[in-house]
Amino acid sequence: MKKKQLTAAIMTALMTMSASAYAAEQTTAMDSYELAPVDVAGQRTTETGTMTAETASLGALGGGNVLETPVNVISYTDETLKKSFVPTRGFLNAATNNPSVMVGGASTDNNVELQIRGIEFNTHDILLDGVPGMIMMQNQPTNYIGRMEIIAGPNAVVSGIGLQQSASGFVNFVPKKAEAKPNLDITTSYASSRYFSHGIDWGQRFGKNQEWGIRVNAETHNGHTTMSGEDLHGRDLYVNIDHEDAKSKSSFLYGYDTEVNHGMPEVLRIKDANWGTSVTRLPAANSVVKNFMPRWALLSHTHRVYLLQHEQKLGRHLTVYAKAGIMHRDWPGYITAKPFLQNDAGDYTLDISGSSTMG
């Protein structure tokens, strides 16, 4: 009886092992298989009111998707500029949306302490639709800008070599141009302490195939800023005329802006203070005035720009382009100075000089 039970137990164990081995073989065979090709068709919808754009201008590399470019680029739309606007800091507030860009605490668009990746960057380095030397150090109007492209890092291949080009990166202003759908926007805004601005943005395309387009942006502003004792008033006009067909693109941009700025804040200079004698430490924050400049300090400018460009397709994979521009600037009023720290109490001196041809 015991022999029969032992034989039955051995047979049961062998059958279980065989079944397990067979099941394992079957499982291994099912782990590897190949599906037939699957094609997925879809259409990307264009969103409106976005903060960033999908495309950017890349100089010699042409235009392209920002996700496919060999450089670090972020392309901000005019929505970013609108939502970042503060009097005298519109451009700076928008630029610092990029984590590679830093701005000094007392900077304004006129008095810039800008850095890209820790390296100093001047507003003279800003490109206008890929052309250097068209932007001056001033309170930058942003109402005519359709995209603001910021490239961080080496950029000579993309931007070319400007007279004062920074190795840290560059900023490119892309002007608005007429779109397929006509637009007319009239805006009035109030900000800070009695600071008013009024603007118009009109664009339309013409021709049998809408090959011609015109975009007009104009703005006037006047009032006090958030800085104590500072006020400014100015106006601007930018007109962009373009032509586009299957083989070519051409455009001509005219820009004019002028501004009078009284009491523009300056940064307190501590580097040249008499350290170790009259100055031994930084003064307490509450002992320093909010604005070192008097209300009658003056900084006024007039800025004109003319920009012509043409792009021609010579073949499926070959395109040539040419761009040329002229910029004229004038400072009819310049009465300002840098404040120098004198002692631990926060006293400072100003040696104001300059001239004015304004009436």
Predicted region positions:
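Cleavable N-terminal targeting peptides that direct proteins into the secretory/outer-membrane pathway or into
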Residues: 1-31
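Short, solvent-exposed beta-strand-terminating loops
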Residues: 39-53, 259, 325, 329-339
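Short, flexible, mixed-charge acidic loops at enzyme active sites
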Residues: 52-60, 164-165, 267-271, 276-280, ...
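Transmembrane beta-barrel wall of Gram-negative outer-membrane proteins
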Residues: 183-185, 190-287, 295-320, 324
